[in-house]
């Protein structure tokens, strides 16, 4: 599993790549029993991945302090992506959140760290046995279901 600083460095690099997919592997999916119990999905053997599309989407949709303030949230920073392993390994909440725009099932992992609630959304790519970052948000306090 890459270190937090390496993931943050990847996220910074990912912002400059729009014409092709680049990714960093974050390791095998853990918390398997909790995921299965909360969502019904068996992700044994799946790999967790962060790619430039997830980084770019998150920063475009949730990276503006002014926009997030209007939503009652806090802007995501590139360094926040380094928290993904912690958020997904020891989440406070896991839930299935339906399907995304391309029809893939999505799972939400929420965790409060130092008073900040992180909501990390991943899509399941069953054919390739991957879970890939779809989006991330953050706010003061915990996220509810």
Model-derived segments and their meaning:
Residues 1-145:
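Ribonuclease/tRNase effector modules and their secretory precursors
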């Amino acid at each position: 599993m890459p270190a937090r600083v390496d993931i943050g460095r990847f996220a910074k690099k990912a912002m400059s790549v729009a014409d092709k997919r680049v990714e960093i592997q974050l390791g095998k999916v853990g918390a398997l029993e909790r995921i299965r119990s909360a969502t019904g999905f068996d992700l044994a053997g799946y790999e967790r991945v962060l790619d430039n599309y997830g980084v770019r989407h998150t920063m475009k949709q949730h990276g503006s302090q002014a926009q997030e303030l209007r939503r009652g949230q806090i802007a995501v920073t590139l360094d926040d992506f380094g928290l993904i392993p912690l958020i997904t390994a020891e989440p406070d909440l896991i839930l299935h959140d339906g399907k995304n725009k391309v029809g893939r099932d999505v799972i939400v992992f929420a965790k409060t760290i130092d008073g900040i609630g992180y909501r990390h959304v991943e899509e399941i790519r069953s054919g390739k046995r991957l879970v890939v970052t779809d989006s991330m948000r953050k706010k003061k306090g915990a996220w509810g279901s």
